[in-house]
Amino acid sequence: MPSVDLNSDLAEGFGIWHLTEDEALMDIVSSANIACGLHAGDPEIMAKAFAYAKSRGVAVGAHPGFPDLWGFGRRRMPFTPGEIERLVAYQVGAAQALATYSGHRITYVKVHGALGNIAEQEPEVAVAVANAVKAVDPSLVVLAGPLGAQAPATRDAGLRLAAEIFADRGYTEQGHLIPRSQPGAMIHDPVAAADRIIAMVQSGAVITAQGTHLPTSIDSICVHGDGPKAVETARYVRERLEAAGIAIAPFAP
């Protein structure tokens, strides 16, 4: 039976404030991207998320972003490529430490928000991310879009790439995510999200907002944990995939 991973961005909160429904989503997904403390997350939330993921057999990865609490890591910040390398390395190290503390281990890295968008479009930033991952632990997989700058940068660094598509985001004709400020960027309807995912997985392509098919491998599907219907969407996407004969399994167990 063919399989694909289902992931979500989790541990996104601070103190008593929690944005994501971590436990509900980890009962559905096969991989959890854990915020590393700069755009969201703190030691307590991270440790709890790692421990629960371990108990559910969910793979975990580091989800580093810009240090922008106010903007949730979704605004560009003026860091140089060298500074981005160290920023990513710092957060991956924090995730490794707290995963180990919790009896789990991270197996991959996926950059968050604005940093992820920039890394997909600017080769020097993609190289910085790859360099950081390789320096910290070259066994870690990089989870990223298959049609942007991260794919070649990851491979050139000798790292393994896992190709990710999004259930709840629209795509441009270039295979990038439509900016959140533009129409068609977000897909909130669980049925529409699942319909798109089934079509993309079965056709082996990213399908743009205009209907263009951009052929690619697909290793993982992301449902954003902060969406208003995140749990409902993740559950429905999983049910539809399994009904289509596609198993859900982590790409980096």
UniProtKB/Swiss-Prot annotation:
Cross-referenced SUPFAM superfamilies: Glycoside hydrolase/deacetylase
Biological process terms in GO annotation: carbohydrate metabolic process
Catalytic activity: 5-oxo-L-proline + ATP + 2 H2O = L-glutamate + ADP + phosphate + H(+)
Enzyme class, UniProt record, top EC level: hydrolase
Pfam families on file: LamB_YcsF
Keyword ATP-binding (UniProt): yes
InterPro entries from the UniProt entry: Glyco_hydro/deAcase_b/a-brl, LamB/YcsF/PxpA-like
Keywords attached to this entry: ATP-binding, Hydrolase, Nucleotide-binding
Enzyme Commission (EC) number: 3.5.2.9
Record's keyword annotation contains Phosphoprotein: no
GO molecular function: 5-oxoprolinase (ATP-hydrolyzing) activity; ATP binding
Protein function: Catalyzes the cleavage of 5-oxoproline to form L-glutamate coupled to the hydrolysis of ATP to ADP and inorganic phosphate.
Family membership noted in the UniProt record: Belongs to the LamB/PxpA family.
Quaternary data: Forms a complex composed of PxpA, PxpB and PxpC.
UniProt protein name: 5-oxoprolinase subunit A
Organism: Azorhizobium caulinodans (strain ATCC 43989 / DSM 5975 / JCM 20966 / LMG 6465 / NBRC 14845 / NCIMB 13405 / ORS 571)
